[in-house]
Amino acid sequence: MPGKKAPNGEFAGRKLKLKRKKFRWSDIRYKRRVLRLKEKSDPLEGAPQARGIVLEKIAVEAKQPNSGMRKAVRVQLIKNGKVVTAFCPGDGAINFIDEHDEVIIEGIGGPKGGSMGDIPGIRYKVVKVNRVSLKELVKGRKEKPRR
């Protein structure tokens, strides 16, 4: 039978499976997962959290229809020197963070590892400042250690 491409014998199962596998490479999600492209391009290198040094404090304008300045910091990661922007959650949280402080950042929890809500282009949030939880500092339960 001319033009027939798939084997169809009694013992052709292995060959059929191998043939199907080739087509998976045209699926972008499969390709990215198998080649581990997310970890390679991710500043945190696949880790859940990372340590960094605060370079500067910045305010980012919220997306429409909201208005207001969302407080964030530019952080240089210790493990690879990459610079990322991290959001400071909580009322007055930015006042507990100074330049050259050591912070721990983690993903902000947006869809597909992206930004969240009305904060444009910020994928990370500050969790700890000088080894003290930012949440505790904001609530007033703990004090920032003096150097």
Swiss-Prot record:
Transmembrane segments: none
Record keyword Phosphoprotein present: no
CDD domains noted in UniProt: Ribosomal_S23
One Gene Ontology term, aspect cellular component: small ribosomal subunit
Superkingdom of the source species: Archaea
GO aspect biological process, one term: translation
SUPFAM superfamilies per UniProt: Nucleic acid-binding proteins
Keywords: Ribonucleoprotein, Ribosomal protein, RNA-binding, rRNA-binding
GO molecular function terms noted in the UniProt entry: rRNA binding; structural constituent of ribosome
Annotated Gene3D superfamilies: Nucleic acid-binding proteins
UniProt function note: With S4 and S5 plays an important role in translational accuracy. Located at the interface of the 30S and 50S subunits.
Known partners and oligomeric status: Part of the 30S ribosomal subunit.
Family designation: Belongs to the universal ribosomal protein uS12 family.
Name of the featured protein: Small ribosomal subunit protein uS12
